[in-house]
Amino acid sequence: MFVMLISVTDKSIHGKNMNGYLKRILNARVYDVAIETPLEVAQNLSARTGNTILLKREDMQPVFSFKLRGAYNKMAQLTQEQLKRGVITASAGNHAQGVALSAQKLGCKAVIVMPTTTPQVKIEAVKHFGKRSVEIVLHGDSYNDAYDHA
């Protein structure tokens, strides 16, 4: 296992130009809703591997997961017309919470389809983060059932 950190001054990785990729990262609007989380040294894992292993503490995000970053970044790129129409997703967990918080922050309606087997704690978290922006639909016994329904 290795962790690679790329600084803004790096020009390439594995022979590929990273300027466009880094520009997209630096211009992402995720910090409208996400927090900048620290890197922490994983002492035991570093000792076992003989390398310095850093962990990105995404558990410190408002939804306790990195999934908020992708959901918000995608939704923040939608046009006003698209946001007005709303979004729909299928998820039984962290992605649902990320979409819910993103919808609430962007003033967008979101339908989140979750399997009927979703733990109540996850359903309540989605309600909490989405407030009145979210409609939860429980459908099917599995993620695939929920996905097909969405």
Regions found by a protein language model. Give the residues of each.
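PLP-dependent amino-acid enzyme catalytic core
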Residues: V3-A150
